[in-house]
Amino acid sequence: MPTIQQLIRHGRSMKASKTASPALEKCPQKRGVCTRVYTTTPKKPNSALRKVARVRLSNKIEVTAYIPGEGHNLQEHSIVLIRGGRVKDLPGVRYHIVRGSLDTSGVADRKQSRSKYGAKQPKAGAAKK
């Protein structure tokens, strides 16, 4: 425990908080180019083939980003927009690709939570039975 004299000389230092998405460099989103699009398996209790892409960002940093939603049109050299947000059961995946922006299409036939997946509002005639 410091003495009062030591506190007068040095003061208390604030602990610097670490960002969860350092590659974004304090930006809300960043643009990048897909270098590889592939599937990977999640951690122990879960089982699936999760779609991910290796993305080279405009600041030359290469990251792994998750492709949300069912089906996608991404391939190598697709230009994508990424945002922060990790995937809990995929180690090393700390970013999400934004659906419906740049080369990424929105999720087809999405009825709920459409804004999160870049899906347009369905036509009024199609919704009625």
Swiss-Prot record:
Residues 116-129 have a biased composition (Low complexity). CDD domains: Ribosomal_S12. Residues 101-129 are annotated as: Disordered. GO terms for biological process: translation. The keyword Nucleotide-binding does not apply. GO terms for molecular function: rRNA binding; structural constituent of ribosome; tRNA binding. Keywords: Methylation, Ribonucleoprotein, Ribosomal protein, RNA-binding, rRNA-binding, tRNA-binding. One of its GO terms (cellular component) is small ribosomal subunit. The modification 3-methylthioaspartic acid is found at D89. SUPFAM superfamilies: Nucleic acid-binding proteins. The keyword Protease does not apply. With S4 and S5 plays an important role in translational accuracy. Part of the 30S ribosomal subunit. Contacts proteins S8 and S17. May interact with IF1 in the 30S initiation complex. HAMAP family: Ribosomal_uS12_B (MF_00403_B). Belongs to the universal ribosomal protein uS12 family. This is Small ribosomal subunit protein uS12. It comes from Chlorobaculum parvum (strain DSM 263 / NCIMB 8327) (Chlorobium vibrioforme subsp. thiosulfatophilum). The lineage of its organism: Bacteria, Pseudomonadati, Chlorobiota, Chlorobiia, Chlorobiales. The gene is rpsL.
